[in-house]
Regions:
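A polyanion-binding, active-site-adjacent surface
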Residues: 6-8, 15-163, 167-177, 182-185, ...
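Short, low-complexity, intrinsically disordered N-terminal peptides in bacterial proteins
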Residues: 1-5
Length: 224
């Protein structure tokens, strides 16, 4: 059985990592990689978790499945490697960031600095076949990422959750906790829905206000 090291997340997810469905999921993804192209690269499958350990989580931005075109998916929701053309949803996120906080538009789409500052950028499905959106959506990833969200109930620190679009908002029942929580819902930032309420939703300032109200430092949302 393949051993997955999730660092500090491992104790929170041990039951999932040992479950038969998870072994079958990894086997299926491995077979898909052997037969064709799967994104993100294998070493980046769990990057969202390893980049933002549980004790550092201050905000969670939930995505769907990874980008399915070459060179884009890097293991963080909405993020692309520096130098890659910005996908439309990310471009809209940056527009809202500028409107909300007055920050300059970033030069690139790598959101790793956010992850390192405590923003968990989690897709609900962690792999995808090349050119085939949602191709791995029914493989078992959602059971695993639901467990990640449910495990965060045990985190004692204040955490803000950002749920963009109806798919993300279905996860709201998993986010109950005795610790301080903020759940922000808005339409998805894709061009199809961004003008229905994503623009003007001001998530970044709301997250920082919530954190400061609960005695925490605000997130530094600046990007290169």
């Amino acid at each position: 059985m393949q051993v997955i090291d999730l660092g500090a997340w491992t104790p929170y997810l041990e039951q999932e990592l040992r479950a038969p469905y998870f072994a079958a999921l990894l086997q299926r993804v491995g077979a898909a990689r052997a037969a064709g192209t799967v994104y993100p690269p294998e070493e980046r499958t769990f990057f969202a978790l390893t980049a933002t350990p549980p004790e550092r989580v201050r905000a969670v931005i939930l995505g769907q499945d990874p980008y399915h075109e070459p060179g884009q998916a890097m293991g963080l929701a909405f993020s692309v490697p520096q130098g890659e053309r910005l996908p439309p949803s990310l471009r809209n996120i940056f527009t809202e960031l500028h409107t909300d906080l007055g920050l300059p538009q970033p030069f690139g789409g790598d959101l790793t600095p956010w992850a390192e500052r405590g923003v968990l950028l989690l897709n609900t499905v962690l792999t995808v076949g090349r050119g085939a959106a949602n191709s791995h959506a029914a493989w078992g990833w959602q059971r695993f990422t639901d467990a990640v969200l449910a495990a965060m109930a045990a985190l004692p620190q204040p955490v803000a959750f950002v749920l963009w679009g109806s798919q993300a908002q279905k996860k709201r029942p998993l986010l109950q906790s005795a610790a301080p929580r903020l759940v922000l819902c808005a339409p998805h930032p894709s061009p199809l829905s961004s003008y229905r309420g994503f623009f003007g939703s001001r998530p970044f300032s709301q997250i920082n206000a919530f954190l400061q109200e609960n005695g925490e430092q605000p997130v530094d949302w600046r990007l290169p």
